[in-house]
Amino acid sequence: MSELKTISIRGAREHNLKGIDLDLPRNKLIVMTGLSGSGKSSLAFDTIYAEGQRRYVESLSAYARQFLEMMQKPDVDQIDGLSPAISIEQKTTSRNPRSTVGTVTEIYDYMRLLFARVGVPYSPATGLPIESQTVSQMVDRILAFEEGTRLYILAPIVRGRKGEYKKELAELMKKGFQRVKVDGQFYEIADVPALDKKYKHDIDVVVDRAVVRPDMAARLADSLETCLKLADGLAIAEFADKPLPPEDTAAGGSANKSLNETHERVLFSEKFACPVSGFTIPEIEPRLFSFNNPFGACPSCDGLGSQQKVDENLIVPEPARTLRDGAIAPWAKSSSPYYNQTLEALGKAFGFKLSSKWTDLSKEAQHAILQGTDDKIEFNYQDGARSYKTVKNFEGIVPNLERRWKETDSAWAREEIERYMSAAPCPACAGYRLKPEALAVKINKLHIGEVTQMSIRKARDWFEVLPENLNAKQNEIAVRILKEIRERLRFLNDVGLDYLSLSRNSGTLSGGESQRIRLASQIGSGLTGVLYVLDEPSIGLHQRDNARLLETLKHLRDIGNTVIVVEHDEDAILTADYVVDIGPAAGIHGGQVIAEGTPQDVMANPKSLTGKYLSGELGVAVPAERRKPKKGREIKVFGARGNNLQNVTAAVPLGVFTAVTGVSGGGKSTFLIETLYKSAARRVMGAREIPAEHDRIDGFEFIDKVIDIDQSPIGRTPRSNPATYTGAFTPIRDWFAGLPEAKARGYAPGRFSFNVKGGRCEACQGDGVIKIEMHFLPDVYVTCDVCHGKRYNRETLDVTFKGKSIADVLDMTVEEGVEFFAAVPAVRDKLQSLFDVGLGYIKVGQQANTLSGGEAQRVKLAKELSKRSTGRTLYILDEPTTGLHFHDVNKLLEMLHALVEQGNSVVVIEHNLEVIKTADWIIDIGPEGGTGGGEVVATGTPEDIVKVERSYTGHFLKELLDRRPAGKREAAE
């Protein structure tokens, strides 16, 4: 059979698609573009990917299927020519604190193998390589214990491994051994209970029981030799009379202890031990370097690298306040007189009053309040009618909160205390996450933790020259491992992530970064014959790195894959082999293929809006004149040092539209979000944000509100929707409750809520669907057969306005809602603001968890726009053009500039040059990412920036300003 040349789709009707018929070439780079909400994702993800994935999963056995997420069958007549599909979406990787860039890309797994096979252990005490111990050295060490010490000499034959071990125990009995220690208990071998093979076990053989005496060297040597033979070079001397406190054992919750570690013990190894300090490394194997395994994880922080500690700066966030005014944050909200009476007693002892500012207290007094007192103090308490006196040490706020945090079972109390805690690097492992034994193993003078903290760029150089520093035997072992590591580092470099470090927590990555990491992992896997579907991989990527990303996508295509990319980036569209433009507009007005073919075909098609923007017929105009910043009206940040910022001092002018630009990882978000926004939120809005390190910030007196409009979901449950979030649902319910029929029945607005009993359908509890769990198939959501998906009971649905019930209103698009409620300003204005941000196509009651990041951000923007402006608000947006077509960018810019016209200030972090060129002022941070960035490269108007040689942004902006004519801001029709 000849190989299929196309993916043929017939009758695709998922979501708003209007029965699309389409033939896509296989093994090509295909870009799907079109207005936001036109149906690109419905076609790429919900139809093509869903069907490719579903068919692959269906080919597996029923047993395997239960572990995989099954996709629903999309609404399509027929698809031919599909391959197994892999989707790489915009979701951030993992919120798990144990997940790092190294573990996600599997580079860390290869590094563990490398260190286990060619690493050399060094003694922390002497700094010299560790040699193996001889039996005589072990005997001398035991004889040095106090005479009369009772010991068990044990051979650890099983250490933290799963299994039943019946055969091994029977073998031991044959050899004449009688007792074993299993999971912390001693047993006669015949009496050992059956072990569950699903759990990890520890088994030590009791080789000898001895009391230390000078004349027993020969017997000890004999016993130790037996141990070393049994346990592959290991032996343990356990002190029979020195039990460990319960909290230091595995049973007491110490995750990184062997179950057999119930008493103090000394581990001997004929492999690795320091003769001076006796520091011993049990066995060098890959799991010793895993911070997710008890054998490698640092016992203090359980391999997290940081510990939650009460932070004194959060206890006293505003030191200029007086004690009575609430300088001590955890006590400020309480109405109980107890806290003030406690402070009065401390004041008598340390000479301060409640009217004193925190900064005026002596160091001794501050220490006493925060950390407690050694001396006893007299406290007088009066509680209504009761008064009493007590003399005691004062525990201190910090120890008190830490104790309560450890002891409490209440999640609420824990959360409350965590507001005053911050993560500090673990003092035991210095943030490297591993045991001292693992950090003692080095290659070329560095341990594994130091290598993971390098940037990917530096690590790549280090691994390149590593073979020169290894001997012939080490090189022979390492050659294949190094090849894998180098390749993966190269791919990360190719997708523009060379500024990240391998130890970076994956939860702190942006959506674009985590998508590109997964992309790098996919290239590393080297699969061919696969269908890849990607969602805007260029998000968060500077124009400079775009070419490298596109090369990566072309590489995926060249090795024999079909790559479908949903993308708005001009370079990506022009690089594609085949472009599909979906439109003509959003929502119900979209869902059709407007143009398809090569980029030139699309540009030549008069119907294609995308084509008009690509050919330059339409465009975002450069403003004829830019607003001039007023002298002195600015927020100035001094000495910002968070993450990679290098003592940055920069001013953000107010009353203008400012763009913060620069390459990925340069420090834009650290400067704008972590430093400026968090300080402003704290000072202006009283929020409990912890800003990144800086000296001071001036100019907050010019603003009365600061709002960060980000891309996080507007709600995580299906019950949250645009109407509830923007506040439109309240006037809608009030309106229905005011209708004559509702009044006659005595219905209040609560009757029209699907979240509370009364008006909602109780069969599905207002969800409209009922979830049925199917173990080998995807969970099935069936429409509720009582309310038929309407979410309300019949009585509530009897109340109608213009023939529509409340359920019909929730099912309207925003555009229909604006028309329907034209005579109800309270509802119309809120829906109009959603329509203005280009969301006319979403349903009024659309579930929040089905909105994309860009849509969620625009819903938030609409909510802010519908509020009455004070003209003194600072709006901060991080990449607002995510998911926006050129045409939508035009609309968005109109709205942002409208906010500025009202006297507000707008600051955006942006890579999109169409936005940057319309800015009044630019702050360019860089020049490189990571350690090569963190400086202000240039500030000024776009025309000023293009003259700065060091600015990458200026370089790309120059091409654009030279190419496009100036004019008024073009209205988006």
Curated annotation (Swiss-Prot):
GO terms for cellular component: cytoplasm; excinuclease repair complex. Disulfide bonds: none annotated. ATP binds at residues 34-41, 662-669. It is found in: Cytoplasm. InterPro entries: ABC_transporter-like_ATP-bd, ABC_transporter-like_CS, ATP_grasp_subdomain_1, P-loop_NTPase, UvrA, UvrA_DNA-bd, UvrA_inter. GO terms for biological process: nucleotide-excision repair; SOS response. One of its GO terms (molecular function) is zinc ion binding. A zinc finger (C4-type) spans 761-787. Coiled coil: none annotated. Keywords: ATP-binding, Cytoplasm, DNA damage, DNA excision, DNA repair, DNA-binding, Excision nuclease, Metal-binding, Nucleotide-binding, Repeat, SOS response, Zinc, Zinc-finger. Residues 331-609, 629-958 form the ABC transporter domain. It comes from the Bacteria. Forms a heterotetramer with UvrB during the search for lesions. The UvrABC repair system catalyzes the recognition and processing of DNA lesions. UvrA is an ATPase and a DNA-binding protein. A damage recognition complex composed of 2 UvrA and 2 UvrB subunits scans DNA for abnormalities. When the presence of a lesion has been verified by UvrB, the UvrA molecules dissociate. Belongs to the ABC transporter superfamily. UvrA family. This is UvrABC system protein A. It comes from Agrobacterium fabrum (strain C58 / ATCC 33970).
